[in-house]
């Protein structure tokens, strides 16, 4: 049965595909060259109007590097005035006191800053630029002095797997309000050979569950739908009932929100379930966003757990996990196939 269509909770919007770095794991394979045909300022404002007419989601201004787009502050202010909660994802290297104050004036409520290693060697290797780590830390220091809330995002891969605990400690030392881990999906420049093994994937998520119990900052696993299965398995073992009081926001949501509570909009207006799943839902230059969100075939299928195939289709956790549809697509060409990086066997007690 297809679930009733709700307004999106989050929209990740690639304001520009241009970037000042050359990250090895970049979803969009962004470069310093800005592609032709990106949405104009007027088109961006029209899109915000459309979004605000159907709900008030969190609007994530992303890239590329969104701070390379000259009208980023104008667009952010417009989103804020439309009643959206505007946040911005950055690599942190371009942050200055002046830019931070402009972001504050535009109503941006939080920044996410990417740190992919606990030291310069690992982080710079990810970012494709010597000195990126120090520049990012300098940007974070600007945020700290300005008392501007920020979270740290880390993409987990073989390159930094054994540094995750140290990177988490670094995030706390830097004063982050949250630490989000993303698990590499082989899209764009993301290389399949850099993906962690299914066993390591499971191990890190179990560690994450234990850290959530005692952490004073928010922890969130993204592109890791298995976490919601693990959370329930562990809570059952511990005799804990999952609730907002015990598990916070995670008690109210599910693993993969792609197409159900989340979507990705590219710099040229293309709409996808997420930035890692290249199955086109529509283009906001060609049809209203509401129409795409409510009627796109890929979204309708993703909203129906009965469409899932393989072991995901028979799994008792499919309504809270659903597997990573982008990984299924990368491995098989079918986004409804079973999640290739899950070691769980459905029905196992």
Curated annotation (Swiss-Prot):
Domain Radical SAM core as annotated: residue spans: 5-214
GO molecular function: 4 iron, 4 sulfur cluster binding; metal ion binding; oxidoreductase activity
Gene3D superfamilies (UniProt xref): Aldolase class I (3.20.20.70)
CDD domains cross-referenced by the UniProt entry: Radical_SAM, SPASM_MftC-like
Cofactor note: May bind 2 [4Fe-4S] clusters.
Keyword Metal-binding: yes
One of the GO BP terms on file: heme biosynthetic process
Cofactor: [4Fe-4S] cluster
EC number: 1.3.98.6
Function: Involved in siroheme-dependent heme b biosynthesis. Catalyzes the conversion of Fe-coproporphyrin III into heme by the oxidative decarboxylation of two propionate side chains.
Family under the similarity heading: Belongs to the radical SAM superfamily.
Name of this protein: AdoMet-dependent heme synthase
Native source species: Methanosarcina barkeri (strain Fusaro / DSM 804)
């Amino acid at each position: 049965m297809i679930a009733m269509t709700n307004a999106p909770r989050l929209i990740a919007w690639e304001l520009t595909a241009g970037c000042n770095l050359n990250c090895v794991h970049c979803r969009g394979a962004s470069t310093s060259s800005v592609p032709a045909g990106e949405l104009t300022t007027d088109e961006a404002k029209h899109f915000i109007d459309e979004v605000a007419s159907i709900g008030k989601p969190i609007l994530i201004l992303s890239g590329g590097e969104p701070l390379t787009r000259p009208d980023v502050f104008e667009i952010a202010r417009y989103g804020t005035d439309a009643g959206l909660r505007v946040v911005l994802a950055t690599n942190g290297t371009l942050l200055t006191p002046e830019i931070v104050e402009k972001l504050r004036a535009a109503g941006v409520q939080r920044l996410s800053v990417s740190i992919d290693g606990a030291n310069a060697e690992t982080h710079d290797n990810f970012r494709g630029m010597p000195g990126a780590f120090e520049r990012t830390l300098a940007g974070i220091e600007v945020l700290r002095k300005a008392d501007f809330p920020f979270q740290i995002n880390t993409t987990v891969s073989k390159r930094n797997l054994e540094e995750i605990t140290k990177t988490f400690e670094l995030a706390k030392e830097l004063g982050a309000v949250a630490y989000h881990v993303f698990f590499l999906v082989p899209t764009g420049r993301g290389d399949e050979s850099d993906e962690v093994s299914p066993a390591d994937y499971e191990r890190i998520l179990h560690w994450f569950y234990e850290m959530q119990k005692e952490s004073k900052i928010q922890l969130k696993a993204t592109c890791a739908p298995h976490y919601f299965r693990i959370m329930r398995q562990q809570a059952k073992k511990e005799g804990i009932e999952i609730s907002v009081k015990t598990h916070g926001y995670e008690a109210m949501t599910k693993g993969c929100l792609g197409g159900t509570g989340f979507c990705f909009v590219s710099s040229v207006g293309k709409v996808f379930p997420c930035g890692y799943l290249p199955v086109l839902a529509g283009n906001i230059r060609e049809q209203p966003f509401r129409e795409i969100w409510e009627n796109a075939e890929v979204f309708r299928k993703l909203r129906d757990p009965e469409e899932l195939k393989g072991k995901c289709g028979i799994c008792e956790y499919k309504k809270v996990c659903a597997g990573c549809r982008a990984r299924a697509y990368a491995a098989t060409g079918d986004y409804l196939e079973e999640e290739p990086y899950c070691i769980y066997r459905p029905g196992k007690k």
